[in-house]
Design a protein with these regions (language model features):
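Catalytic cores and adjacent flexible loops of soluble metabolic enzymes
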Residues: 1-123
Length: 123
């Protein structure tokens, strides 16, 4: 996919090395992530203060709620990956507790766009 020049998102949740797994290319965007379901505040101590100062274009969110995704946007993340479910209570699959239901996802999109517009405007 990368060699076909297709847009590719790579979450680096388990990547422990300083260098990136592939050389930087225009069609690759890396996402900051902690591969734990769900993550806690303690797991996010190394969360980027400013995504523009990193190799990460965005955040792969495994936190409960939408607050960390919104924080990432406020810190310059251009891409948010968030799990989605129609009903968190319909299964025991661990991803569902941290997934966004339709209303939460809508809030994430609307508030995230508002934050992004304010940043773009220079506020």
């Amino acid at each position: 996919i990368v060699n076909l020049n297709k847009k590719t998102f790579i979450s680096l949740g388990m990547w422990e090395k300083k260098e990136l797994p592939l050389e930087k290319r225009e069609n690759i965007d890396y996402l900051w992530c902690k591969s734990k379901y769900p993550t806690t505040n303690d797991d996010l101590k190394n969360f980027p203060k400013n995504f523009k100062d990193t190799d990460y274009a965005g955040y792969s969110d495994h936190n409960i709620g939408i607050d960390m995704a919104l924080l990432a946007i406020s810190r310059g993340a251009r891409i948010i990956e968030k799990h989605f479910t129609l009903d968190k209570t319909s299964t025991v699959i661990r991803d569902h507790v941290l997934s966004a239901e339709p209303e939460e996802f809508s809030d994430l999109v609307n508030i995230g766009r508002s934050i992004y517009e304010k940043i773009k405007f220079g506020i």
